[in-house]
UniProtKB/Swiss-Prot annotation:
GO terms for molecular function: NADH dehydrogenase (ubiquinone) activity. The chain crosses the membrane at residues 1-21, 29-49, 58-78. Pfam families: Oxidored_q2 (PF00420). PANTHER family: NADH-UBIQUINONE OXIDOREDUCTASE CHAIN 4L (PTHR11434:SF0), NADH-UBIQUINONE OXIDOREDUCTASE SUBUNIT ND4L (PTHR11434). This is NADH-ubiquinone oxidoreductase chain 4L. Core subunit of respiratory chain NADH dehydrogenase (Complex I) which is composed of 45 different subunits. One of its GO terms (biological process) is ATP synthesis coupled electron transport. Core subunit of the mitochondrial membrane respiratory chain NADH dehydrogenase (Complex I) which catalyzes electron transfer from NADH through the respiratory chain, using ubiquinone as an electron acceptor. Part of the enzyme membrane arm which is embedded in the lipid bilayer and involved in proton translocation. Belongs to the complex I subunit 4L family. InterPro entries: NADH_UbQ_OxRdtase_chain4L/K, NUOK/Mnh_C1-like. It is found in: Mitochondrion inner membrane. It comes from Semnopithecus entellus.
Length: 98
């Protein structure tokens, strides 16, 4: 496995560990989620370039579209929650309260 793939997988694992460790704030969870999506985007782009298959180039673009939608929804939830409750702690939120 080339070193570039190992670096990208390491960045995904570090973002995943950050998501698991720093899950108390919604903002830090969103940042770790964006780091995971960025590493997945770079990995899928490199795979599409190495496959030499024209239809494989659609996958990174579709992943980027879903990542942008996820970021927009996440930031909208962050603004809504911080305006309603005044903080962004994840453990204070419940499905029954929202």
């Amino acid at each position: 496995m080339p070193i570039i793939y190992m670096n990208i997988m390491l960045s995904f694992i570090i973002s995943l560990l950050g998501m698991l460790i720093y899950r108390s704030h919604l903002m830090s969870s969103l940042l770790c989620l964006e780091g995971m999506m960025l590493s997945l985007f770079i990995m899928s782009t490199l795979m599409a370039l190495n496959m030499h298959f024209p239809l494989a180039n659609i996958v990174p673009v579709a992943l980027l579209v879903f990542a942008a939608c996820e970021a927009a929804v996440g930031l909208a939830l962050l603004v809504s929650i911080s305006n309603t409750y005044g903080l962004d702690y994840v453990h204070n939120l419940s499905l029954l309260q929202c």
